[in-house]
Amino acid sequence: MRKLLNTLYVTTPERYLALDGENVLVLEEKKILIRLPLHNLEGIVTFGYTGVSPALMGACAKRGISLSFMNPNGQFLASVSGENKGNVILRKQQYRISDSLEDSIPIARNMIIGKIYNSKWVLERATRDHALQVDVDAIKKVTANLDEHIRQLLECDSMDRIRGIEGNAASQYFSVFDQLILQNKEEFFFENRNRRPPLDNVNAMLLFAYTLLANECAVALTAVGLDAYVGFLHTDRPGRISLALDLMEELRAVYADRFVLTLINKKTIKPEHFVKKENGAVLMNDTGRKTMISAWQGRKRDKIKHPFLGDKIEWGLIPHVQALLLARLIRGDLDEYPVFLWK
C-alpha cells in the first residue's frame, strides 16, 4: 500500500519556493522561513503568484512530487509534472472508453450512485446523531427521494439522464444542507450553492474544500498512470481535470462536505476568517485557509476501513485507492468500478 506522505500548502502570496540540495525552501524577501526534505513530500500546492524556482520544478518533476499552482482564491491555475511512467496502453484504453458512450455510461453511473448514496448517508447520520437539532421529517423526505434517484440510476443507460438525475439529487441534498449547520447560524448559513463567486461563508468553505479534493484526485490519477484531463462523466474542456472531477463525485459528501460541517460545528472556523469583496464575493482570508488546511491534513491521517478492500487505511489514501481501482477496471481486471460507499 502506498505510504501517505505530506503535502506542503503555501497560502501566503508573498512566499517564494526554491531548492537547496534535497530540501525545499519557503522564503519571503530572501529570508528562509521553512526548510523541508523533499523525500517527506508527495505534493506542493501554492496559493499565490510570487513563484517557484526552475530548479525546484525540475526536482519535483524528477521525484514525482506534484506541484500545483492556485490563485489566492483557490482557483486552479497550472501544475508541473514529470514523465508519466504509467503504461501507455492503459491511457490509450482510457481514451477509447472516454470516446465510447456505451463504455463510459456504466462507470459514470456507478460514480453518481456512489455520490447519491454517500450524500444520503451524511443526511441519515445527522438525523441519528442530532435528532433534537434538525428537522428529521424534512431530511427523511429527502433521503427517500435520494433512494428513488438511486433506483432510477440502476436502470439508466443515457449519459444525459445520468447527469439529470445527479443534478436533481444534488438539489435535493442541498435543500436541507442548512439543517446540518448546528453552530453560529447567524454567520454560517446555507441557502443554495453558489460558487463563481461564493456569496457566503459556507459556500466559500465548500469551494476551498472541493479545490483541495480535486487536486488530490488529479494527483492520484496521474500517479497510477491515468490522464486526469480525460473523463467519462465530465466532458473534455481545455484545462479541466475532467477525470479528477469524475472521481471526486463519490467523495464530495463524505470527504469534503462533512469536513466543512465539522469545522463549522466545532467552531474551528470563525467569522473573522472571511473577507467580503465589493462585488459580494466572500473569500477565505490567509488565516482561514491556513486553519482549514491544517485541519484537512489532520483529517487525512484518520483511519477508516475501506468498504471494498476491507483494509484499514488513512482517509488521505482514499483518492489513490479509488484511482487504482479505476485503473484496474480500465485494464480489464475488474468487471465494474467499485465505487466508494461509506458505511
For the regions a protein language model found, what residue spans apply to each?
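Active-site helix-to-loop segments that bind/position phosphate- or nucleotide-bearing substrates
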Residues: 1-19, 29, 35, 87-229, ...
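Terminal-proximal segments
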Residues: 1-72, 82
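A surface-exposed, charged beta-strand/loop segment in the N-terminal or early-internal portion
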Residues: 40, 48-121
